[in-house]
Structure formats: structure tokens, C-alpha cells
Amino acid sequence: MGILFLETGSNVRPSQVYYDRDYSAFATMSPNQLDWKEILGDTRWLHWTGITPALSENAAQMCRQAIATANEMGVTVSCDINYRDNLWNYGKTATEVMSELVAKSDVILGNEEDCEKVFGIKPLGFDAEQTKGQVEQTSFASVCKQMMGRFPRCKKMVVTLRGSINANQNTWSGVLYDGRTFMQSRSYLITDIVAVSYTHLRAHETR
């Protein structure tokens, strides 16, 4: 079983996450153990995250097979980039592996840090030192456009935005771009939830 430990931050000291995922059942599975055509037989949507291909080369290959099968079967594929530097330890970089996988996804979720660290894409006109913990959503329209330009299969791009005031206070919002329209959520002040990860967008097909 893969587990993680959270050292909660205080005031200006950020929280720290420690991963213990080596030799977990999932990280050591063989790609040939799963029949993706059978698994996806009655499925309309496959969602994967960047945690999976980061765990091991076998896990990356399983993810690659799942996405390829979903593409062949006409199943919508969404991904959460979810970059975790500490997990990429088997000799391949996130950029090398994720570029191929994200290119075959129809919906991409991430934050500005994911896009920059994995793909080198930055929000135009954004200066983190000038934010004072507040995030201007319109600055990130360029991230959405750049990502969709790099990955033309993508039909929708979602960017989550967290402004860090201190270890105990964060602002939280998001933007969505569908290639034509740029949509923004309201901004929330989060004071009572540990920001280990974010709640994933629950995507539904438009009928």
C-alpha cells in the first residue's frame, strides 16, 4: 500500500509531504496484468493522474496502455497533471513521459506550477512576487491557450489557482477554457482545510 505523511506547516513555514510508495502493489504491477478493453468495455470516461506514471516504469506503461485503449474505443480521456517531483525516481523525467500521455488526453487539469515545471509553460505577465497571496485569474488564460496549442487533442483546459497567504490561509479558485470561452470561478478563502491536494473536477458528458 502506498502511503504519505504530512508535516503540517505553521505561519510562514509551509507544509511538507513525505511519500512512501516504493514497492507498493500498484508500483510493482506488470502492464500485462490488466485487460484494458475489458475494463473499459462499458466506460465513457477514463481519468488518470500524473501520480501513476511517476511511480515506476511499469506504472507508466500501464497508464500508456490504458490511454491508448481508451482512444481506440472512443472513450473520453481526462488527466490531472498532478506533478510531484519526489516521485520521479526511476530514470525518466516527467516532461519525457507526461508529454506523450497528455497529448492523448481530451481534458487537461492542472495548476500553473504543473504546467511550468513539466512543460515550461508560464502565465504571461504574471509576477509571483507581486501577488501578495492573491491570484489574478485572467493572467492564466494564456496558460490554457498555450497548453491547448501544444496539445491540440485537448478540448478543455482547467487550471486551479491557489494563492498562499501563509501555511494556514490560502485563496482557491479555478479557470476553464474550451478553446473559445474563458470561464472563471469565484475565489474562496480557505482557512480550515489542509491543502495537500485539491478536489478533482467531476466531469460529466454534455448531453
Regions found by a protein language model. Give the residues of each.
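Hydrophobic faces of well-ordered beta-strands that scaffold small-molecule active sites
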Residues: 77-79
